[in-house]
Amino acid sequence: MGSLEMVPMGAGPPSPGGDPDGDDGGNNSQYPSASGSSGNTPTPPNDEERESNEEPPPPYEDPYWGNGDRHSDYQPLGTQDQSLYLGLQHDGNDGLPPPPYSPRDDSSQHIYEEAGRGSMNPVCLPVIVAPYLFWLAAIAASCFTASVSTVVTATGLALSLLLLAAVASSYAAAQRKLLTPVTVLTAVVFFAICLTWRIEDPPFNSLLFALLAAAGGLQGIYVLVMLVLLILAYRRRWRRLTVCGGIMFLACVLVLIVDAVLQLSPLLGAVTVVSMTLLLLAFVLWLSSPGGLGTLGAALLTLAAALALLASLILGTLNLTTMFLLMLLWTLVVLLICSSCSSCPLTKILLARLFLYALALLLLASALIAGGSILQTNFKSLSSTEFIPNLFCMLLLIVAGILFILAILTEWGSGNRTYGPVFMCLGGLLTMVAGAVWLTVMTNTLLSAWILTAGFLIFLIGFALFGVIRCCRYCCYYCLTLESEERPPTPYRNTV
């Protein structure tokens, strides 16, 4: 029975002259002496001494665990061969192995998350701020034929923006010293325009129109750059000065809109509403994504809408066909150039969705301009019974624009691709309702039909962005039944 006794690990077989139980301390190699000789061996310690002298096990990071000895099966991740993970070099984890017992969920990754999110890239500034030249030129063109009160209000708005720019330049001068001389240039050009306005006759002076557009462009570029730099510098700690500047800016915009409505110029009000709303949209997009696809999206959306508004004012009173074709061609060219320069399939998918959003924006902008034109044409001849349906339809178009803003912010801000298309579909339905009401009361049949068509196209774009499969999954009874059934749990396999 002595041969069946358990032998401690690492101990050799019992010596021939020893006890069968291996307890003879004379020749037992389990307890070598300090001098290395096998003759003078101490007596084996008892249980109490063993427990007191027993060393704790080596830590997990100890090199002993990964040197290929008897514990080599338990090597830590840091000491394993890195060639095992060569297939993970492009998985967004810098080639490191996944942590143990933590499955990777690709759906949790932000699809619009960009690598290297950092500070604002100065190279993108001319691309982003260029649309505002067209916006303010369009507003200036509307003011060119408007009343004196509208011109005075626009002047007050520009002066307020200059004051806000002067305040912002004091904070941004340390980072962007080149923009400080632009303040002086903008002020000189603006007051030169005001002086020319007082001296010359506005309706017959093309030079005045060009100077006014140039002044508006300079103001727009400078003020927006200053605002962005100011908000980027203090977005995490909102100062009282920033809040006051924002309130002043919104108050000036509100005054301009109210003045445009009171002066029986709904077209100017519609242009201003669309311009300022898109300005805010691009501004939020830029803040949420300082570089990369977010900046590209802001640039494309704002440029498309701005050029659409400018084309509608230059090419005629309301030349929707020419405006739509020009903007569609321009957006297609830009997106094709961007997609050809990128080999990433994810980038191409995002650019395709961006093109659909830009197309919906063009349709919505044209519907707003058409609604403003209908309201302006029939404003003087409207009775009290006809005024309420027209005002209701215009409010529906404004709500559709707000829903479009929510769709953009939801998709490009949070990465949620479900609620953005839903908001766009709702905006398209509201636009269709407005066009149907105007078509029912026989108010400018051509423009009403276009608003109805634009709403239908916006709804189709939202449905395409949402996806037919996802719509079936969320709305179909059988898909909901399958989703509600309990599935058997599957064990997790940690395979690399």
Curated annotation (Swiss-Prot):
Entry-linked InterPro entries: Herpes_LMP2 (IPR010881)
Cytoplasmic side: 1-123, 169-177, 232-240, 288-295, 339-353, 409-421, 470-496
Additional remarks: In healthy individuals, EBV typically establishes a persistent latent infection in which the virus can be detected in resting, nonproliferating peripheral B-lymphocytes. These latently infected cells express only 2 virally encoded genes, LMP2A and EBNA1.
Motif PPxY motif boundaries: 97-101
Phosphotyrosine modification, residue list: 112
Listed transmembrane segments: 124-144, 148-168, 178-197, 211-231, 241-261, 267-287, 296-316, 318-338, 354-374, 388-408, 422-442, 449-469
Biased composition (Polar residues): 27-41
PTM annotation, UniProt: Can be ubiquitinated by human ITCH and WWP2 on the N-terminus in a lysine-independent manner.
Name of the protein this chain belongs to: Latent membrane protein 2
Extracellular side: 145-147, 198-210, 262-266, 317, 375-387, 443-448
Family the entry assigns: Belongs to the herpesviridae LMP-2 family.
Region entry Disordered, spans: 1-108
Record keywords, A-Z: Host cell membrane, Host cytoplasm, Host membrane, Host-virus interaction, Membrane, Modulation of host E3 ubiquitin ligases by virus, Modulation of host ubiquitin pathway by virus, Phosphoprotein, Transmembrane, Transmembrane helix, Ubl conjugation
A single Gene Ontology CC term: host cell perinuclear region of cytoplasm
Pfam families: Herpes_LMP2
GO biological process: one example: symbiont-mediated perturbation of host ubiquitin-like protein modification
